[in-house]
């Protein structure tokens, strides 16, 4: 079951991140927020995160950074070269699953 981004980070916090106060773009903001969240979840590759409460604060912060990049540069073409968000990757690095699988339950 996929985790809904708005269960992890509120819509109002996403709007604060991009300094947007109106309600006319809520659907678009939610779409980009979910895409940023999914990107960060795939990057970390931690199958132990099953519910919103499992997501560490650093990963939530990274989601906000990636979301802001996606929202600001939402056109397919850009006059400037875009790069991976190094700050977001540093925030997620310690939470990345390098084992390739979930930790087994103790006593199992």
Curated annotation (Swiss-Prot):
It is found in: Virion. It comes from the Viruses. Its main location: virion. Keywords: Viral genome ejection through host cell envelope, Viral long flexible tail ejection system, Viral penetration into host cytoplasm, Virion, Virus entry into host cell. InterPro entries: Gp6_gp15-like, Phage_gp6-like_head-tail, Phage_HK97_gp6-like. Signal peptide: none annotated. Head completion protein that exhibits an open central channel for viral DNA ejection. Part of the head-tail connector by binding to the portal protein and to the head completion protein gp7. Belongs to the Caudoviricetes gp6/gp15 head completion protein family. Homotridecamer. Interacts with the stopper protein gp7. Interacts with the portal protein; this interaction occurs at the end of the packaging when the terminase complex is replaced by the connector. This is Head completion protein gp6. It comes from Enterobacteria phage HK97.
């Amino acid at each position: 079951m996929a985790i809904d981004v708005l269960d992890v980070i509120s819509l109002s916090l996403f709007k604060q991140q991009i300094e947007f106060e109106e309600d006319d773009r809520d659907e678009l903001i939610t779409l980009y927020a979910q895409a940023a969240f999914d990107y960060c979840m795939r990057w970390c590759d931690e199958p132990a995160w099953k519910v919103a409460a499992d997501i560490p604060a650093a990963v939530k912060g990274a989601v906000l950074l990636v979301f802001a990049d996606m929202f600001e540069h939402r056109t397919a073409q850009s006059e400037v070269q875009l790069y991976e968000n190094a700050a977001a990757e540093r925030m997620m690095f310690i939470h990345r699953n390098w084992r390739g699988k979930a930790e087994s339950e103790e006593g199992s």
